[in-house]
Swiss-Prot record:
Record-linked CDD domains: HATPase_MutL-MLH-PMS-like, MutL_Trans_MutL
InterPro entries: DNA_mismatch_repair_CS (IPR014762), DNA_mismatch_repair_MutL (IPR020667), DNA_mismatch_S5_2-like (IPR013507), HATPase_C_sf (IPR036890), MutL/Mlh/PMS (IPR002099), MutL/Mlh/Pms-like (IPR038973), MutL_C (IPR014790), MutL_C_dimsub (IPR042120)
Source lineage: Bacteria, Pseudomonadati, Pseudomonadota, Gammaproteobacteria, Enterobacterales
Name of the protein in its database record: DNA mismatch repair protein MutL
Recorded GO CC terms: mismatch repair complex
A molecular function (GO) term: mismatched DNA binding
A Pfam entry, by short name: HATPase_c_3
Gly residues compositional bias, start-end: 382-392
Family matches, as PANTHER family: DNA MISMATCH REPAIR PROTEIN MLH, PMS, MUTL (PTHR10073), DNA MISMATCH REPAIR PROTEIN MLH1 (PTHR10073:SF12)
One GO-annotated biological process of the protein: mismatch repair
Family membership: Belongs to the DNA mismatch repair MutL/HexB family.
Coiled coil: none
Secretion signal, residue range per the UniProt entry: none
Organism listed in the record: Salmonella schwarzengrund (strain CVM19633)
Keywords noted in UniProt: DNA damage, DNA repair
Length: 618
């Protein structure tokens, strides 16, 4: 087949594979667009779990008629215009892919009107070339997006959708996360014509507490310790539940936002868990709602297709900052729970929102509001770091950033407070709580060893050895087999008669390890491998594995997993702080026995006493 340029619709459908995972992904992208447009009210109407209809209606600034066609085109956006903008993202969207991708796998209609226009206009794309048709329509100022029959033209994607209830639960979780990020926006969620959730916009701290309680529940609010921690351009705000009273019901409340964007960052999670570990039992997990504000130049959000992850330029600084902030408030937890006497019952989950800390360039003009006075914390659980902690000037949980850099015309006026950060898997798996930890990573020594501090002792940890144990744990099946990842291009290998016999004997065990294959007369075709092997050179690793199996007389999954773990290539020839912290977090979660009883070659204590004695003088 010759090299050729893909048709626009097919190209968009490929992009949709990363952007549009399920109906909840569509809701996330479209609501984020509404928030970037300065909307103060967003109505979300869902039918049949999003498979039949997703309608997002907002009162934002709208889209001009001449820009409607561009809005449905790939890589067309109003959020960035230069590389400088990309390196300092403060809006939720910036790639300009969502609408084009969604319209390629559904029947999408975009209706919008700006305040300057006398009439609204409607646009939709259809056909192989995704030609956009624009026609007049009736609509107030703002935008409505209707997504009908999601995945109607990609049956393979549609068959992977879950039940109506499951898909709607994912959407409900997305809106819940957005509601925690934006207290200043009213969000109404309906399903099959029935209002299910109503999060009303709020401004006052007391109302925000009620909204927090309505979203996260009264048990969380009763144990919530307020955090206000600052150092330079870093600010940490939010709530963490008192670990001494954390219950199983609270462990699913683990929400973290970076510049208003919902994140699933292992570095942040590790810092929080490490701060709480001394107060948590072996079967407990931390519960928190935290907002991290950082200079946009110091964080890269363009590292994940769905923007669920970020990369910090100074990961060690961020980790230690969060650790100290959470630890400080836990040490000052005497009588720090939030007052509940003014909390109104929330019968139908009718919570509220937060105030944006800046004027939106796209927002519809509004009457000037009275100057706001700096908010003062109502609770005694707050802690401030650095220069005493600056009070927020727009109400909780937003603060004016500690940086004032030129961002270009668009960024000077965009919302300085990020908004939603949806996410992860619908009901994201909670962090595993641990009473045991390797300790705190101080630095990387020799490129492949981490210097750790724990309970006043210093130790060196071999990162390659820890990585090998982690791989073995990931490859060893538990109560269920290891999940197999299908290969885009199956690997076909020629095998000898002895190797073929060995493969047939070990086929069931290999299947438990996530390795699936088919064999014929002289060849074997590898069709799936476990996730830890996806980035390996399978053309070298698999023949070596087959040779190993041919030399064995008996087979066991543990032995095979151990052999694979010892023979895979490390993905990190040079380790960074962030990689080391992430690795240890995974090892502590999957291999807690290594913390209690480290095997040989993993940890080596560092004798500081002899060094200190050598420095002493009579």
């Amino acid at each position: 087949m010759p090299i050729q340029v893909l048709p626009p619709q097919l190209a968009n459908q490929i992009a949709a594979g990363e952007v549009v995972e399920r109906p909840a992904s569509v809701v996330k992208e479209l609501v984020e667009n509404s928030l970037d447009a300065g909307a103060t009210r967003v109505d979300i109407d869902i039918e049949r779990g999003g498979a039949k209809l997703i309608r997002i209606r907002d009162n934002g600034c709208g889209i001009k008629k001449e820009e409607l066609a561009l809005a449905l085109a790939r890589h067309a956006t109003s959020k960035i215009a230069s590389l400088d903008d990309l390196e300092a993202i403060i809006s939720l969207g910036f790639r300009g892919e969502a609408l084009a991708s969604i319209s390629s796998v559904s029947r999408l209609t975009l209706t919008s009107r700006t305040a300057e226009q006398a009439e609204a206009w409607q646009a939709y794309a259809e056909g192989r070339d995704m030609d956009v048709t624009v026609k007049p329509a009736a609509h107030p100022v703002g935008t409505t997006l209707e997504v009908l029959d999601l995945f109607y033209n990609t049956p393979a994607r549609r068959k992977f959708m879950r039940t109506e209830k499951t898909e709607f639960n994912h959407i409900d979780e997305i809106i819940r996360r957005i509601a925690l990020a934006r207290f200043d926006v009213t969000l109404n969620l309906s399903h099959n014509g029935k209002l299910v959730r109503q999060y009303r916009a709020v401004a006052k701290d007391g109302q925000k507490e009620r909204r927090l309680g309505a979203i996260c529940g009264t048990p969380f609010l009763e144990q919530a310790l307020a955090i206000e921690w600052q150092h330079g351009d870093l600010t940490l705000r939010g709530w963490v539940a008192d670990p001494n009273h954390t219950t199983t019901a609270l462990t699913e409340i683990q929400y973290c936002y970076v510049n208003g964007r919902m994140m699933r960052d292992r570095l942040i999670n590790h810092a929080i868990r490490q701060a709480c570990e001394d107060k948590l039992g072996a079967d407990q997990q931390p519960a928190f709602v935290l907002y991290l504000e950082i200079d946009p130049h110091q964080v890269d959000v363009n590292v994940h297709p769905a923007k669920h992850e970020v990369r910090f330029h100074q990961s060690r600084l961020v980790h230690d900052f969060i650790y100290q902030g959470v630890l400080s408030v836990l040490q000052q937890q005497t009588e720090t729970t939030l007052p509940l006497e003014d909390i109104a019952p929330a019968p139908r989950h009718v919570p509220e929102n937060r105030i944006a800390a800046g004027r939106n360039h796209f927002a519809v003009p509004a009457e000037p509001t009275a100057a706001r006075e700096p908010a003062t914390p109502r609770y005694s659980g707050g802690a401030s770091g650095g220069n005493g902690g600056r009070q927020s000037a727009g109400g909780w949980p937003h603060a004016q950033p500690g940086y004032q850099k030129q961002q270009g015309e668009v960024y000077r006026t965009l919302l300085q407070t990020p908004a939603t950060s949806p996410a992860p898997e619908p009901v994201a798996p909670a962090l595993d709580g641990h009473s045991q930890s390797f300790g705190r990573v101080l630095t990387i020594v020799g490129g492949d060893c981490a210097l750790l501090e724990h309970a006043g002792t210093i130790q060196l940890l071999s990162l390659p050895v820890a990585e090998r144990w982690l791989r073995q744990a990931q490859l060893t099946p538990g109560q269920s087999p290891v999940c197999a990842q299908p290969l885009l291009i199956p690997l076909r290998l020629k095998v000898s008669a002895d190797e073929k016999v060995a493969l047939q004997k070990a086929q069931s065990l290999l299947g438990e390890l996530g390795i699936e294959f088919q064999s014929d007369a002289q060849h074997v075709t590898i069709r799936a491998v476990p996730l830890p092997l996806r980035q390996q050179n399978l053309q070298i690793l698999i023949p070596e594995l087959i040779g190993y199996l041919a030399q064995q007389t008996t087979f066991a999954t543990v032995n095979i997993a151990q052999w694979i773990a010892r023979n895979v290539q490390s993905e990190h020839p040079q380790w960074s702080m962030a990689q080391a912290i992430s690795l240890l977090a995974d090892v502590e979660r999957l291999c807690p026995q290594l913390v209690k009883a480290p095997p040989g070659g993993l940890l080596q204590p560092v004798d500081l006493h002899s060094a200190m004695n050598a420095l002493k003088h009579e």
